[in-house]
Amino acid sequence: QLFDTVDPLISIDMSEYMEKYAVSRLIGSPPGYVGYDEAGQLTEKVRRHPYSVVLFDEIEKAHPDVMNILLQILDEGKINDAQGRTVDFSNTVICMTSNAGSSDRTALTGFGRTEEQVSREKSMKALQEFLRPEFLGRVDEVITFRPLEQADLEKIAALMLDEYKPGLEARGLKLEYTPQALAAIVNETSTRFGARELRKTIRKTLEDPVAEAIVAGRLTGGQTVTLAADADGKPQLVLPE
């Protein structure tokens, strides 16, 4: 909503920076080291696109030296890359994601405490185990996400289905789906670990049958593919005869 497009998003997967030797790739290798002529993967992107959203995914996997770099960025709003150029982060929005505490959210809430309160307390406790106090103190807000509900998952399923529309429209085909189909897809999927499993159900229900029908010549331009739900509440693909 900030930029109305995903283009300004700079996503950094912290699983690629678990080792000490990989940390220098963020701001570039120092003089005399391999890769000195190459720009830092973080600093160069921000230098070229100063108005960006920077996402550090799964921050708990990063090497401690990465935290030192981030601490300087959060504290001063800028950092020097390996070429000696000052990169300004004052116009960026920095987000960090973490799975801290996600494996220990099944305890009883107790009297007078909601599930969200308990979840936030466990998440904060887990964050404090790998983030230093001075780092946490420079974070503006810590947001704890609640488990996805039925309505949330149906909206996500709709977005996933919409991704198929441009490809089908390029072949002259139209995709339609009903609200009952969205509910059926969610009910057919095990969403205990989030919404990623929805894509498997959609692939099995929509993508594979439509691809087979196109290859077999049963679908031609001007036809409509409809995803609905049968009498048992299962997702059902209706192909034109």
Where are these regions (language model features)?
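AAA+ P-loop NTPase nucleotide-binding core of proteostasis motors
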Residues: Q1-E241
